[in-house]
Amino acid sequence: MLPALETTLPLLLFWGGIGYLLGSVPFGMVITRAFGLGNLREIGSGNIGTTNVLRTGSKAAAAATLLLDGGKGAAAVLLARALAGEDAAQLAGLLAFLGHCFPVWLGFKGGKGVATFLGLMLALAWPVGIACCLTWLGVAVLRRISSLAALCAAVAAPVWCLLLGAPQAAVLSALLALVILWRHRENIARLRAGTEPKIGQK
């Protein structure tokens, strides 16, 4: 189920653009440079997300990246919802997520979108967002593999939407889950081979 269309096309395009610009801010790279940790593209996997920031050895930098990457997804949703409507909020959230994954500033080579996904789900439907966060946390604690935790949280999101009374977010969450699965295709191959590194490993 999708939200009813209640916003004009020009406003939808505007909020989609705002969402994309918010999402495309590469906080992981900004923070690692601000902390004097070097160029994130030359560290670990070269990814701009929280897991790779953690490979610098700075838990503070990783926590800041997690909060800001999640925050930009939430901000896009909350701003669009407050000033336009639910349809604009979902579009802004989607574009914030895609902005993180494909930022124009980095030649469309960004992160895998997990923190931004969790942030925008918390803003769209907080019970679903909390359930997704707990899913991620549970798998991460039990298996110590960040990518597996992310995949489980993403795949569970549409189910949580239906179980927790947020069917209007189910289609969007399913679309985001598909993108996350695709962005993690190399991780999936390593998981199948048993070579995926655990959290904290470089």
Curated annotation (Swiss-Prot):
- What cellular-component terms does GO give this entry? plasma membrane
Pfam families in alphabetical order: G3P_acyltransf
Q: Which GO terms describe its biological process?
A: phospholipid biosynthetic process
The pathway entry for this protein reads as: Lipid metabolism; phospholipid metabolism
Question: What does this protein's UniProt record list under function?
Answer: Catalyzes the transfer of an acyl group from acyl-phosphate (acyl-PO(4)) to glycerol-3-phosphate (G3P) to form lysophosphatidic acid (LPA). This enzyme utilizes acyl-phosphate as fatty acyl donor, but not acyl-CoA or acyl-ACP.
Its top-level enzyme class, in one word, is transferase
Name of the protein this chain belongs to: Glycerol-3-phosphate acyltransferase
Instruction: List the coiled-coil residues.
Output: none
Q: Which family does it belong to?
A: Belongs to the PlsY family.
Cross-referenced InterPro entries: G3P_acylTferase_PlsY
Listed GO MF terms = acyl-phosphate glycerol-3-phosphate acyltransferase activity
Q: Which organism is it from?
A: Ruegeria sp. (strain TM1040) (Silicibacter sp.)
Give the gene symbol: plsY
